[in-house]
Amino acid sequence: MEKINRRIVLLVLPFMAMPIMGQEKPDEEALPTLVKDVETTIAADVVSQYIWRGQDLGNVSLQPTLGVGYKGFSLNAWGSVGLSEPKDTKEFDLTVAYTIGRLNVGVTDYWFDAGLDPDNRYFKYGAHETNHVFEANIGYDFGLLSVQWFTNFAGNDGVNKHGHRAYSSYMEVTAPFRLATCDWTAAVGAVPYATSFYNTNGFAVTNVSLKATKEIRVTDTFAIPIFGQIAANPRSQKAYLVVGFTLQP
């Protein structure tokens, strides 16, 4: 009988150990290098007004972000939906980008709920019946200043004075600095030539802005960045005051 009991114990022990082994956390050093180097971004901004490159695109809005990055490469999804006004712009953008040193390049697929497709279908890519706008950008960070250039190359782009595709472009210079416990960013943006996409008849400064951000610490491990921004569009002679906050784990 004693020999039989020993045999039963020997048979049961491996099965008793299995749940315990299943609960063990994976050793980070044993993970493949690819998995360890991938970074994930999950965040959401809530803003009092949606101002983009000097254009008023809506009132109070929720703007979520989901992205992954790996060794300079990144793929990000970004969206915007109005909270106070259902008719505000709905937007869903996908951006693939690469940064090496101080140089960055990228391509963005913008989708708006207004365009050439009256049914506002996302998977509608026909040249003359889509709400998508495809944009390429290149930029360089000089340290004190960062310069970016953006050009639409396909989709629902604007037209120039002659009614032809404008290849609408926008360039922006930004200068980050720190002052009085806040992180500040000053920016000046301009449209270099005529396009209906930005509602310009030629070269025009469309964005002059100053933004301040400060973290409000909630716990030792969690803080909420609060930001305020003054933005003006000399072309349209309009000015905006925006406040918002970011939620990010």
Question: Across the structure, where does each feature detected by a protein language model lie?
Answer:
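Membrane-embedded beta-strand positions of outer-membrane beta-barrel proteins
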Residues: 42-44, 66, 75-77, 96, ...
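Transmembrane beta-strands of outer-membrane beta-barrel pores
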Residues: 46-50, 70-72, 79-83, 100-102, ...
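Detector for outer-membrane/organellar transmembrane beta-barrel domains
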Residues: 124-195
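Short loop/turn motifs that connect adjacent beta-strands in outer-membrane beta-barrel proteins
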Residues: 24-39, 106, 177-185, 213-226
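Outer-membrane beta-barrel "beta-signal"
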Residues: 24-26, 210, 237-249
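Residues that define the transmembrane beta-barrel architecture of outer-membrane proteins
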Residues: 36-40, 58-62, 88-92, 101, ...
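Short glycine/proline- and aromatic-enriched beta-strand/turn motifs that initiate or cap beta-hairpins
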Residues: 23-83
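Cleavable N-terminal export/targeting peptides
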Residues: 1-39
